[in-house]
Amino acid sequence: KNTLRPLMSGGGQEMNLRSGTLSPALCVGLGEACKDLTDNREKYTKHFEEIKSSLLSDLENSNLEYVINGNIEQRIPNNLNIAIKGKVAEQLFNFMPHIALSSGSACTSGTIEISHVLSAMKLDDDRIDGSFRISAGRKTTKEEIKELIKSLNNE
């Protein structure tokens, strides 16, 4: 049996593992965000599917040689990971400071190591180097997707 030591000492909340009072404002904010998602899930999913469709169409009509990493259907609707042949993702980002992209998974954002997820998929190093994640938000527009494709084409 392993005994866990408290992160902080104090009032004994969280079974004596982490003392401290939760922020009421943050708790209310989380509740409102959950309510918003519950109330608007279909609307948001439709929006993300439209954005993904626009992105795929614009990629197909571009001069870019690209490949989608992972299954196109079995993924969350607002997320796509692609590799562009002959490009290094980190170098692309230097020319597009106005566009937020990531070459790692969301949980390793900011690290300089290659993606453990793409490595586990047995992708070659060149493909991993050219891979990046595109995540859309509720306010992402089709015009922003077109701007992304233009930037990737160095236009």
Model regions: which residues?
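Pyridoxal 5′-phosphate
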Residues: 1-155
